[in-house]
Design a protein with these regions (language model features):
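A short, charged, amphipathic alpha-helix used as a generic interaction element across diverse proteins
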Residues: 43-61
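A short, exposed loop/beta-hairpin motif centered on an aromatic-Gly-Thr core
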Residues: 33-47
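Short N-terminal "domain-start" leader segments
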Residues: 1-24
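Short, acidic, Ser/Thr-enriched surface-loop or helix-capping motifs
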Residues: 30
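Short acidic DE-rich linear segments
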Residues: 64-68
């Protein structure tokens, strides 16, 4: 694994990395320290970064407005 990018957004951490198959993936760590790994694969780090930011936006909205 080769880390390409680490970004902090609204209490979340986005990690974009290249795996041994030379494809890119992302993981998110939330504000409580829980890591979320995704099965998506991307050809570029930029694409993984965009999708990771979108995932953080969804998680942030969900945490901001709980669905009890």
């Amino acid at each position: 694994m080769n880390i390409q990018n680490i970004i902090g957004i609204d209490g979340y951490t986005l990690i974009v990395y290249r795996s041994s198959d030379q494809l890119y993936r992302f993981s998110i760590i939330d504000s409580s320290g829980i890591a979320f790994n995704f099965d998506n694969i991307f050809l570029t780090a930029e694409e993984a970064n965009i999708k990771g930011r979108n995932a953080i936006e969804i998680a942030f909205d969900f945490d901001k407005h709980p669905q009890y």
